[in-house]
Structure formats: structure tokens, C-alpha cells
Amino acid sequence: MKGLFITFEGTEGSGKSTQAVLLQNRLRDWGHTVRVFREPGGTPIGEEIRHTLKHSLNNAAMTPEAELLLMNASRAQLVREQIRPALARGEIIICDRFYDSTTAYQGYGRQLDLETVRRIIEVAVGNTRPELTLLLQVSAEISTERLRSRQATLPFVRDRLEEANREFFERVANGYQAIAAEEPKRVHTLEASGTKENVQSAIWRLVLPLIARLPRPTERAPGVSAP
């Protein structure tokens, strides 16, 4: 793996999608080739799976096991079609959710057997693992407030995963805490209830040492200094 692989994680409304785009823009300003993907999704097959998982009118009876397998089917396609080739070219990959989401949501949230979850993830990703995972954390109250605000702007877009009860999301949050405790070198928890600028500054401090180890880009935006 010649490039750099960064993932964003967090419960709903944590701001990870916004921060992923801000980081992409900043890295591009420094001259790096950056690709941002979302999960589930990121490929034509993955986007079809995403619709089935989140927005389809026919997914109400979906079982936790089916959800687990579909998530990882999308992931397996993304890893092989997009992530591995881009990393081999030396590019920076930013992924809005990756396998930690499956551990947190399907493992802890849906209460599936964690060892089974890990084995299925292993099939999907193999040795393609992020170097840095940024876990954005907000309180349940802020998460709920942001979700309501987002749903108000998109009233006709149903998201099945956002319809779970509060106990489910509490289990997900606990799952993320367990993941961070298990892999503290990779997973960094950031308080994300502040301004997006302050959160981005904290993210940049973690990313900067990693990009310093990459080959220096040959071209940079005008007026942008090298790392």
C-alpha cells in the first residue's frame, strides 16, 4: 500500500461527511491526489446496495444478518474496484465509514455475534486497512438535533438506518468506544460538537505527520507551501 488510507467514523449527525470533504479540499490544496468514498456505496454496485439498505420501500423486513452481508458486499466491491488500485497509485483515500461501522452498527447495535462480524469483514477487506481512523463524537442530544435538521431539509428521503430507537444508537456509541479502546494507535476519538473549523484543525494535526511521509507532490496550487 503506497498511498494513505483514512477513514471517518461516528454516529449519525457527528459531522463526519462534512469533515471528510473539508479534509479532501485541504489535501488537494497541498497538491495531493485524493479520492473520497462513502459506505455503503462508492461503486455502481455499492450504490445499488446502499439504496436497498437505506432508502428502498421494500426494506422494512430486512434482518440484521442480511444487513451485515449487504454492507460487506458493497465493501468488498469498493475495496477491489476503487480503494486498492488508488492506493497502489500512491493516492490518498478518505472513506466516510468503513468496517468499524459494521462492528459498531451490526455487531453492537444489532447485537450480532462479534466474531462472526469480524470474519465477514475479513473476507470483504482482507489486508486493506486504514492507517488512521477519525472517530467523531457528539452527545446523543446533538446527534438527534442534527438528524432532525437534516430530515427537515430532505423530508421525502427515508433512511431506514436512522429510524432505529435510542437504545440502538446507545449500543452503537458504546461499540465505537470499545473499538477505540482496542486500537488506540489507529482510532482517534475527537469531540465534534464544536465549530467545523475547530474540528478540522484537530483532524489536520493528526493527518499532517502521515502525509509528511508520502512522496512530495510535484505540483501544488499557487501560493500553497509544501509540507
Give residue ranges: language-model regions.
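Conserved lysine of the Walker
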Residues: 16
